[in-house]
């Protein structure tokens, strides 16, 4: 879910948005009971949004909404998380917060597969990069193998990187 494509008039609280991802456990058309509150609270704490649990989702900034959507994914305690452009449409401060959060989640043992065109943020938050360019797959590298300038050169097609 992307914050910039979310209907901000949707009348749901932050807690309800996160808890909605638990319907597979509770059963379709059943209310998410209080027994799931600890899971929801933990997910919101992981993304720094616990204090907003009773706020309507539409009252939050784009960066805050994006953190809520990450909490929604985390509520099921995944081992693998796919993220498509998690920083699109949010301000620079929120981008830094989201990428820092992603880095922390990765350090906690969650494997994160992410598409992103924000090269500096991507290099900062990643420990491995699979670089695709206009001409296709370029290289799979660890962050330590390349500088940000080298990654930018690969993206621009000015350089090809190959491991021996």
For the regions a language model picked out, list residue spans one by one.
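Catalytic Walker B motif of ABC-type/P-loop ATPase nucleotide-binding domains
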Residues: 81-84
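H-loop (His-switch) and adjacent beta-strand-loop-beta switch element
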Residues: 129-142
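H-loop/switch region of ABC-family ATPase nucleotide-binding domains
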Residues: 116-117
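Helix N-cap at the start of a conserved alpha-helix in ABC-type nucleotide-binding domains
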Residues: 92-94
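Conserved ABC ATPase "signature" region
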Residues: 19, 34-52
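Conserved catalytic motifs of ABC-family nucleotide-binding domains
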Residues: 77
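Conserved ABC ATPase signature
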Residues: 56-60
């Amino acid at each position: 879910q992307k914050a910039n494509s979310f209907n901000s008039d949707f009348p749901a609280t932050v807690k309800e948005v996160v808890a909605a991802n638990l319907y597979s456990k509770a059963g379709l058309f059943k209310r998410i009971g209080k027994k799931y509150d600890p899971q929801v609270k933990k997910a919101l704490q992981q993304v720094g949004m616990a204090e907003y649990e009773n706020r309507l989702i539409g009252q939050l900034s784009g960066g805050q909404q994006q953190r809520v959507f990450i909490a929604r994914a985390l509520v099921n305690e995944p081992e693998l998380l796919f993220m498509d452009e998690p920083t699109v449409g949010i301000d620079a401060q929120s981008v830094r917060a989201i990428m820092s959060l992603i880095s922390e989640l990765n350090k906690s043992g969650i494997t994160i597969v992410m598409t992103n065109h924000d090269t500096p943020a991507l290099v900062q938050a990643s420990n491995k990069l699979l670089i695709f360019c206009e001409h296709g797959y370029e290289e799979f590298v660890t962050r330590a193998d390349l500088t940000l300038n080298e990654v930018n050169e690969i993206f621009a097609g000015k350089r090809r990187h190959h491991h021996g």
